[in-house]
Amino acid sequence: VIGGAECNINEHRSLVLLYXSSSXFGE
């Protein structure tokens, strides 16, 4: 479960970074 949680956190961080990058490029 812990390993899965770590993967989930890494995925979430990637999505956040991607979203932030998209917002920056959008502006």
Curated annotation (Swiss-Prot):
GO terms for cellular component: extracellular region. GO terms for molecular function: serine-type peptidase activity; toxin activity. Its main location: secreted. Snake venom serine protease that exhibits alpha-fibrinase and beta-fibrinogenase activities. It replaces missing factors VIII (F8) and IX (F9) in deficient plasmas by activating purified human factor X (F10) into factor Xa. It releases serotonin from platelets and induces platelet aggregation in human (but not in rabbit). Has caseinolytic, arginine-esterase and amidase activities. This is Snake venom serine protease Afaacytin alpha/beta/beta' chains. Keywords: Blood coagulation cascade activating toxin, Disulfide bond, Fibrinogenolytic toxin, Fibrinolytic toxin, Glycoprotein, Hemostasis impairing toxin, Hydrolase, Platelet aggregation activating toxin, Protease, Secreted, Serine protease, Toxin. Heterodimer of an alpha and a beta chain. Subunit beta is constituted of two disulfide-linked polypeptidic chains, beta and beta'. Calcium appears to be required for structural cohesion of the molecule. Inhibited by diisopropylfluorophosphate (DFP), benzamidine, heparin and hirudin, but not by plasmatic thrombin inhibitors, antithrombin-III and ecotin. Expressed by the venom gland. It comes from the Eukaryota. GO terms for biological process: proteolysis. It is found in: Secreted. Its EC number is 3.4.21.-. Belongs to the peptidase S1 family. Snake venom subfamily. Residues 1-27 form the Peptidase S1 domain. It is an enzyme of class 3 (hydrolase).
